[in-house]
């Protein structure tokens, strides 16, 4: 898409262009959403400004996806012609449907010898409930169908709706920390406009800042005169602390503020907890600063100070899953040169004491005395497992080994079954 619209030159072409982190390139996954503005001259002769957000697929980063979707009107649902509809395809599609986005299905990799289009058609209709005629056939590698995708975006995805009052409303959907420029907020301008020199206010903190720079992503940060309604771009406003801006907050004009903030994002609940401690106890403050900077860039990561008899002072950290935990630990080592020790991951337990008091415990060392405990409850997950029919016995055995129970078995098509 970037190549076809001349957003990037031949010289800039590389695999995983929008995956800026070394970790993303090494693991072949997207961890952070990446915005980019492209200009497309359509068949009707008009030039359209399209704001593209490349989001992760893995369920551990679903919060990243949901924030990005809140800044969009539509989504391209990419299905692999050989692999078919995968679990994460479904999970992310439900997020898009909850936000009433226009969904354009794209069947990619049709050039592969193993591509099975009839099977993908059936899955799209049976599992995703989208008529297969709506799907665009494409091969990113061969450049097939790219024009069709761009035309479909122009035709099928509605243009941004804006408030008629012209007051500035800009949703903060992400932010990063720059050592030289401070906090950089990624925003979607819902209404009004913002330019350099303007005084803006954030609703959550009620703080006022002067805008130093605004711009768009092409994919690199590119300064512009202003951001208008419908634009996705960035605002730099002299913020020095990672805590100054909250993801989901609203920027408005200090002199003509809008009456209320935009609906933000639902608070995310960590699922997995682990202790992270510095190997050298003198690095405690440096580790704390590193975590604060990571948190500004990853709102799903939480931490609070704790101490251990064996490991000294460190932090109890919350993550969305095991991959999320692994990525955070690796980023601390690579980006901040931290030498860390991490404890075995655990979940939150609900404990009812004999006196009727209820408490949540995410660290086994904080459990009450055995004689004070009436009941301990652990999280239960309702899981839908899509699998090839021939593996049903093995998977059922695995579920039982993990203390699960199969409540329903449903045949999806000739080859696949869904267990609940």
Feature annotation, model-predicted:
Residues 1-420:
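Structural and coupling elements of P-loop NTPases
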């Amino acid at each position: 898409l970037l190549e076809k619209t001349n957003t990037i030159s031949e010289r800039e072409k590389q695999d995983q262009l929008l995956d800026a982190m070394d970790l993303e390139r090494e693991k072949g996954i997207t961890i952070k959403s990446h915005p980019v503005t492209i200009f497309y001259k359509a068949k009707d002769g008009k030039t359209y400004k399209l704001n593209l957000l490349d989001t992760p697929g893995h369920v551990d980063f679903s919060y990243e996806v949901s924030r990005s979707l809140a800044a969009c009107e539509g989504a391209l649902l990419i299905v692999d012609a050989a692999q078919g509809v995968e679990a994460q395809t479904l999970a992310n599609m439900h997020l898009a449907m909850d936000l009433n986005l226009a969904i354009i299905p794209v069947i990619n990799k049709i050039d592969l010898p193993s591509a099975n289009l009839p099977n993908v058609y059936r899955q799209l209709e049976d599992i995703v409930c989208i008529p297969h005629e709506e799907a665009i056939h494409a091969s990113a590698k061969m450049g097939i169908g790219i024009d069709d995708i761009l035309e479909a975006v122009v035709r099928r995805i509605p243009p941004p709706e804006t408030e008629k009052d012209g007051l500035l409303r800009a949703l903060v959907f992400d932010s990063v920390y720059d050592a030289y420029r401070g906090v950089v907020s990624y925003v979607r301008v819902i209404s009004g406009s913002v330019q350099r020199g303007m005084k803006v206010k954030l609703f959550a903190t009620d703080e006022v800042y002067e805008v130093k720079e605004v711009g768009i992503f092409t994919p690199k940060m590119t300064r512009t005169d202003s951001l208008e309604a419908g634009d996705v771009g960035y605002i730099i406003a002299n913020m020095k602390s990672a805590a100054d801006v909250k993801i989901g907050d609203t920027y408005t004009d200090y002199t003509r503020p809008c009456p209320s903030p935009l609906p933000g994002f639902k608070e995310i609940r960590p699922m997995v907890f682990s202790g992270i401690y510095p190997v050298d106890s003198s690095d405690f403050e440096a580790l704390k600063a590193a975590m604060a900077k990571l948190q500004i860039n990853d709102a799903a990561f939480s931490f609070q100070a704790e101490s251990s008899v064996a490991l000294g002072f460190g932090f109890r950290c919350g993550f969305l899953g095991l991959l999320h935990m692994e990525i955070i630990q690796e980023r601390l080592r690579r980006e901040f040169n931290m030498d860390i020790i991490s404890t075995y991951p655990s979940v939150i337990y609900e404990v009812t004491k004999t006196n009727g008091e209820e408490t949540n415990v995410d660290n086994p060392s904080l459990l009450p005395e055995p004689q004070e405990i009436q009941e301990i409850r652990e999280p239960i997950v309702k899981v839908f497992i899509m699998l090839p029919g021939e593996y049903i016995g093995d998977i059922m055995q695995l579920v039982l080994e993990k203390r699960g129970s199969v409540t329903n078995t449903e045949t999806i098509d000739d080859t696949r079954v869904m267990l609940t």
